[in-house]
Structure formats: C-alpha cells, structure tokens
C-alpha cells in the first residue's frame, strides 16, 4: 500500500486544516477524503456491486465479527477471498471485531452507541465521569474480556467463541481485505477515566501482538494493517494512544495507517480528532471509525 498527499489546507498560522490524498491498494486507488460504504455481511444493503460503483464508492468495509460467524472466514477464503465472494473488484476494508465486543458487552441492552449524544450521556450521574454501577449492570453482557482476548456468545445461536488479537488477524487474512485493523477494545462513552485507561493499555498490548503476528503472514506484503487509537473522551488518553501507535509505526514499517476509534460524544468528535491529528505521523493515512450520519461529514 502506498499513500501520498496531493494537497494540504493550512491556516494563516500554518496549522494543517485538512488534506487530500491517494491511497493505492492492490485493488485500486482510494482518493481521500473518502466515505467508506458499509457492507457488513459482504454486501451493501439494497444495492448491487455495480450500483455501489456507479454511485462513486471506491471502497467497501465488511465486518469481521459477522463474517466470522456466518458464513465463516475459511469458507470465504475457499471462494478466493472477499473480492470474489462479494463480486467487488475495488478496495475492501475489514474491521477487527472490537466494536462488536463493545456492542455485546458494555452497550448490550443499554441503547448506548459507540458515538454517544447528550441523551446517552445524561444516563450518567451529575459528575459526568463516575461509573454508574446501576446503569452498567442493568442488562446482561454476552462478553468477557481478559488480557489474552475476548470470549463471547454468538448473537445467532448462543455458541461460545474466543477471539485473541492473533485470531482476529488470522480471520482478516483469510477474508483477504486490502486494509485490516488491529484488535482493540472499544469502550463506552460513559465509562470513567480509570476504566478508559485500563482498556487503553490493553488495546496497546493487543496492537503490538496484532502487528507482530501480521508481520509473520505472507499476506502482510499485500494487506495493510492499521492500528486503532482509543482513549474515550479524555484528551490525555487520546494523545497517549496516538503517541503509542506512532511509536510502532516508523516511516518504513509498523502500522500502515491508523483508525481513530470510539468512543466519544458526538459533540466532542471534532475535538477528539484534532487531539490525535496533532500527534499521528503526517505521512500515513487515517480512518475515522464508526461515523456515517450526514452531519458527521461536515465537522
């Protein structure tokens, strides 16, 4: 994968406001900034691949968790990978499955999304950042998180599964997307600082493990691996995470790009992006995970 900046916007003080670039993958070029069409189960809902392309989409994102459960990464590999399986000749991204850990765990049954709004956050006590045990214990969790990985029960049939950073990378290699993501823990926007920090450090250890196993795979020559910046709504944690991911990503190695992961309040999204953009290496691409509403495109 090769990324080149074609144009940069700067203000009178020399601060970077935005940029346009070209991301070259084995299946074509992505012109950035780009909206990534979501094809959760290897298909964009209600559209054929030809229609998706005719609308100007250059890249589609498929969901690792859902494809792992149905029809299975090995089966997709037997078809020749995602591109042949979904009849899409352009670039494909797959996420790590980290958001599904969140949706089956901290958010399960609580109507809290990874990008919260003020209505969600009003569920917190007045101090705003204390963990509200009644709120978090009000619904069951289908997930158990440990240092090694995550155990969870399928939302389809209740069967027990276990995913580690190494297994997430293996699944994504079998799927064969052009851009894949390191395994991470996506926390709730309503978690307190203590847990956000604990999860952040775990995500960093998982990132290192994801990168190490990726380097051993033959596919690492053709698949780009992005590390994910976490840290919730905390500036210090966001910047710490960006610094850590950058430290694993020298210009000629390490992560090929970065995802900016949830969670944060929608009202804080622009600020959170600015925090990490000040730290992440300029020469590598970034992807803002978990957005998609029209107003999100005009931060």
Residue ranges and their predicted role:
Residues 201, 213, 223-299:
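Glycine-rich phosphate/ribose-binding loops and adjacent secondary-structure elements
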